[in-house]
UniProtKB/Swiss-Prot annotation:
Belongs to the UreE family. This is Urease accessory protein UreE. GO terms for cellular component: cytoplasm. It comes from Rhodobacter capsulatus. GO terms for biological process: protein folding; protein-containing complex assembly; urea metabolic process. Involved in urease metallocenter assembly. Binds nickel. Probably functions as a nickel donor during metallocenter assembly. Residues 145-156 have a biased composition (Basic and acidic residues). HAMAP family: UreE (MF_00822).
Length: 156
């Protein structure tokens, strides 16, 4: 029986070099605390972080033996949205939907309900397989977690 190496730290993008391997994770899989993962080479390792972490592409898992496993954003189904981006971004944000904002397009996770809404607002929408890197949450959480604002938030 072989020993599974453990990663208990994540190094920030730009703060390391010399990855021994890499792993491509989609948006959901990049939100974790403890999980067994398999790197591109087939090597298994256990992620065992102190708290739930929102991983970003370019970061690295630091294995206990000193090796680094680079985190890459994996391909996943997204909607590429173009048109009046300010207006369209407002509607996407109003639904608390994670969104990757670029100068000439928005990317959201593939969702037929949002696709119908956006087309109804005049957007051009195309389905694609791309890495999804949405904006971090406004309050530092790194994730849009639905409509719950906590116990002291009320709508007027």
């Amino acid at each position: 029986m072989s020993l599974m190496h453990r990663a208990s730290r994540v190094l920030p993008a730009g703060g390391w070099s010399g990855a021994a391997d890499h792993i491509a994770l989609d948006y959901e899989a990049r939100f974790l605390r403890r999980k067994r993962l398999v790197a591109a080479s087939g090597a298994e390792f256990l992620v065992d972080l102190p708290e739930v972490t929102n991983l970003r592409g370019g970061e690295a898992f630091a294995l206990e033996d000193g090796r680094l496993i680079e985190v890459r954003c994996g391909l996943e189904p997204v909607l590429v949205v173009t048109g009046d981006l300010t207006r369209l971004a407002w509607h996407v944000g109003n639904r608390h939907t994670p969104c990757q904002i670029e100068p000439d397009r928005l990317l959201i996770r593939d969702d037929h309900v949002l696709e119908t809404m956006l087309r109804g607002l005049g957007a051009r929408v195309e389905r694609r397989m791309e890495p999804f890197r949405p904006e971090s949450g406004a309050y530092g959480s790194g994730r849009t977690m639905g409509h719950d604002h906590g116990p002291f938030h009320v709508h007027a």
